[in-house]
Curated annotation (Swiss-Prot):
Protein name: Fe(3+) ions import ATP-binding protein FbpC
InterPro entries: AAA+_ATPase, ABC_SmlMolc_Importer, ABC_transporter-like_ATP-bd, ABC_transporter-like_CS, Mo/tungstate-bd_C_term_dom, P-loop_NTPase, Transp-assoc_OB_typ2
Localization of this protein: Cell inner membrane
Family named by the database record: Belongs to the ABC transporter superfamily. Fe(3+) ion importer (TC 3.A.1.10) family.
Enzymatic class: translocase
Name of one Pfam family that matches: TOBE_2
Job of this protein: Part of the ABC transporter complex FbpABC involved in Fe(3+) ions import. Responsible for energy coupling to the transport system.
Predominant subcellular localization, coarse grouping: membrane
Domain ABC transporter: residue ranges: 7-237
SUBUNIT field: The complex is composed of two ATP-binding proteins (FbpC), two transmembrane proteins (FbpB) and a solute-binding protein (FbpA).
Gene Ontology molecular-function annotations: ABC-type ferric iron transporter activity; ATP binding; ATP hydrolysis activity; transmembrane transporter activity
Keyword flag Ion transport: yes
Alphabetical list of Gene3D superfamilies matching this protein: 2.40.50.100, P-loop containing nucleotide triphosphate hydrolases (3.40.50.300)
Length: 351
């Protein structure tokens, strides 16, 4: 059974003076899902989060949570919690007191507070650390405290404002796994904001990409990466080698090289001219091929898990990402490119 829309924004416009930050935006988040707003700085994603939270009021439009119009309600009246980039913990309080703070504001019985705080600390792997203070734990542990403080209130909606930006790479990877696991375990409807593509892909059911206050594309991480709908999306979602070519109904033709079309790539595409994108990992090098596939290796860089290789093909430089087993060529050596049909995408030629 399809889940219902739990958070809905209708015709939202937000202006600061004469500056329109969000213009006529519609957004839906299904119950129990995690949706990420992704985009460059200044695209409006944080403003949308603040509108949902009640920290900003829309210039026009409506916001619904669980079927109720909350447009005019304060943050305290919306049954939501936020996890901030800065953690926003009280340094003069113990970890236990930080997590318990919201429950005490609700004037719950002390025994219920104790049970819920102990459970929340256990959930985020901080069991037995309640008496410590903020300056006695790591950045990753501080973010876990902030997460526990939000979870303990059992909110209808959980909001994340770039929560991992202050952590190093290893901690970010660990924390995004924790966030995703807990969000799924408790089935909490969540809205997440980040500028980091890898982070968005790792935690999200759905990603919404924004640019200058507008939604550019909505989809699963796989859909956005494999089937971008514009040149902006093609470049924003990762490296892409772009060509002019055409599709004849059976094959995709680029510089005389004919690639058998994959149905998932060409579905609903009429015959004609296109801008054709090929992701770096969708190109391999072979020692044999046709004249139209011949290329010259210009440079390579060892990146640990892979090589980044630049080749010259028909007067155009291409970026390839090859694992060590795939790359055993020498520089300046001639080779032949092979495109994986599933790694292509087609954009309108006139764009």
């Amino acid at each position: 059974m399809e889940k219902q829309n739990f958070v809905v924004l209708k015709n939202i416009c937000k202006r600061f003076g004469s500056n329109t930050v969000i213009g006529n935006l519609d957004l839906e988040i299904k119950k129990g899902s995690l949706v990420t707003l992704l985009g460059p700085s200044g695209c409006g994603k944080t403003t949308v989060l603040r509108l949902v939270a009640g920290l900003e009021k829309p210039t026009s439009g409506q916001i619904f949570i669980d079927g109720e119009d909350v447009t005019e309600r304060s943050i305290q009246q919306r049954d939501i919690c936020m996890v901030f980039q800065s953690y926003a913990l009280f340094p003069h309080m113990s970890l236990y007191e930080n997590v318990a703070y919201g429950l005490k504001m609700l004037k719950l019985p002390s025994e219920e507070v104790r049970q819920r705080v102990d459970e929340a600390l256990k959930i985020v792997d901080l069991e037995g650390m309640g008496e410590r203070y903020v300056d006695q734990i790591s950045g990753g542990q501080q973010q876990r405290v902030a997460l526990a403080r939000a979870l303990v209130l059992k909110p209808k909606v959980l909001l994340f404002d770039e929560p991992l930006s202050n952590l190093d790479a290893n901690l970010r990877r660990s924390m995004r796994e924790t966030i995703r696991e807990l969000q799924q375990r408790f089935d909490i409807t969540s809205l997440y904001v980040t500028h980091d593509q890898a982070e968005a892909f790792a935690v999200s059911d759905t990603v919404i990409v924004m640019k200058q206050g507008d939604i550019m594309q909505i989809g699963t991480p796989q859909e956005l990466y494999k089937a971008p709908k514009s040149m902006f999306m093609a470049n924003f979602m990762g490296e892409a080698n772009m060509f002019q070519g055409h599709f004849d109904g059976q094959q995709i033709h680029i510089n005389g090289y004919a690639i058998d079309a994959d149905l998932e790539v060409t579905r609903d595409k009429p015959n004609g001219e296109y801008q054709i994108g090929v992701r770096p990992e969708a190109i391999t090098l072979h020692t044999q091929g046709s004249e139209s596939q011949a290329c010259q290796i210009l440079k390579s860089a060892y990146m640990g898990s892979m090589y980044e290789v630049t080749v010259k093909w028909h007067d155009q430089e291409l970026l390839l990402q090859l694992n060590s087993a795939q790359f055993n060529h020498t520089l300046t050596q001639h080779a032949y490119v092979v495109f994986n049909p599933r790694g292509l995408f087609l954009l309108p030629y006139a764009e």
